[in-house]
Regions:
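Catalytic core of pol beta-like nucleotidyltransferases
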Residues: 1-28, 36-42, 53-113
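Conserved histidines in hydrophobic membrane contexts and catalytic metal-binding motifs
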Residues: 31
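Short hydrophobic/aromatic beta-strand micro-patches
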Residues: 49-51
Length: 113
């Protein structure tokens, strides 16, 4: 049985989202904005916060590919924001309301116990 993640008004298969994140070297993917606050309207986009695996070479082509694939998966327009690129003025509020959707597991050699 596959688990479903509520992404705004859409339900997304957790395994498919995880595969997509691994393909694009995503370390963490979080939901924020109206979808995270359960205030979405039919015309709302889905706000997603992304952090890439350290050292991953993510160029504009790959970033755009991730955006396109997420839009297809969700079935609506999304606004993908890099955690690194968050403006200081909104950073605290975005991080406070962010709901984690995916987190990559650290390789065994990098885990801290």
């Amino acid at each position: 049985m596959s688990l479903k993640i509520q992404l705004g008004m859409a339900q997304v298969d957790e395994a498919i989202l995880a595969d997509l994140c691994r393909r694009y070297h995503v370390r963490e993917l979080s939901l924020f904005g109206s979808a995270a606050r359960d205030e979405m309207r039919p015309d709302s986009d889905v706000d997603l916060l992304v952090e890439f695996v350290p050292g991953a070479k993510v160029d504009l082509f790959e970033y755009s590919g991730l955006m396109l694939d997420l839009s297809k998966l969700i079935g609506r327009k999304e606004d993908l924001v890099s955690k690194k690129g968050l403006k200081p003025l909104i950073r605290a509020s975005v991080l406070k309301e962010a709901r984690l959707l995916y987190a990559a597991r650290a390789p065994f050699s990098q885990r801290h116990y």
